[in-house]
Amino acid sequence: MTITELMLDIAAGDASEDDVHIQECLGHINISAREFAAAYSISEYPGDLPSIIVEAASNAKLPTNKGEAKEVANTAVIQGLSAFYNLMIATAKKVRASTERELRAYAALGKKYGINFDKQNFLTGFLNPLCKAVEKDGLLGKLDDRSFIKGKYAARMVENYGKGMANLMSGYGLSIDNVFGDSVVGLVVRNNYSGKKAIKDLRDVESNMSTGGKQLNFDKTLDKKTHYQDYVNIVDFKTLAISIFALSKISDSIIVTLGNASTKKTAMDNIKRLFNEASDGNKRVVRSVESISDGSKEWSDNLNKLTSNMTGALTDSSYELLKLLKKSKKSK
């Protein structure tokens, strides 16, 4: 693939089939949240339901019996969690596809200096020699505008994504802690991070997912003046490469862990079991169910925005690297 073809591949990579799946998941999550809110208001209504509420519920095809309304509310939350599970897969696939494109840009740079891309020994076998060659050659420098993500922000986005996804998945009793032991990932997601936590009841599900959802809330809109720069130095060049490679490993681990149909069935069966075991009248458990439904909208929004920001920032920056490489080839 030529440099021009690589640039076109990266530029065209903004929209994908994964975006369609992401929007479908977001739609299901929002519908489930609305269904829960309506059924929950009936199930928790103090005293007898007034005729106006009974009529409205009937028109909306909702039960007017409080016990049945509670079952509908719980089912809506379970369906929302199922859609959120699918959202985690769809966003991870979009992220992985992006990292594959961006790593090809670095591989193209390596080829220029006779350095083969080494996935097994990324740092010592590929990136460190590439950084030395690039710095010696004076390839990096000024850009036409602020189009290159600052290395520290790229790393922070990836760290937030890794931690956030680990905690979201722990709400389903699943873990990607094995990926945090990777030597490159450990440079970004630091201190041997673990998202694995015990799940005893729905309060644990809510707590873990709330933690993860908040960790994903990294600057929802990247600002060109704050997060980007109009030059590329060797530190940011290296930090971006490490961040992209770490992100590729994290997203791949998410897909492998979540992508098996039997894994989802087991996870959702456990969620259903927790709902069945939830004590009637336990206000803390009831509040957790409500918080899961309300929170899922915010968590899904954070995940979608961070996914878009990461893939967009990587696309912008990798495109600039290829432009520098193309200019370098023309000048020689």
Predicted feature residues:
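Charged, long alpha-helical segments
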Residues: 98, 109-112
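Membrane-engaging insertion elements
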Residues: 102-109, 328
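Extended amphipathic alpha-helical scaffold segments
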Residues: 78-105
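Intrinsically disordered, low-complexity terminal tails
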Residues: 1-85, 109, 118-122, 129-132
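Long, low-complexity or tandemly repetitive, helically biased scaffold regions used
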Residues: 65-69, 112-332
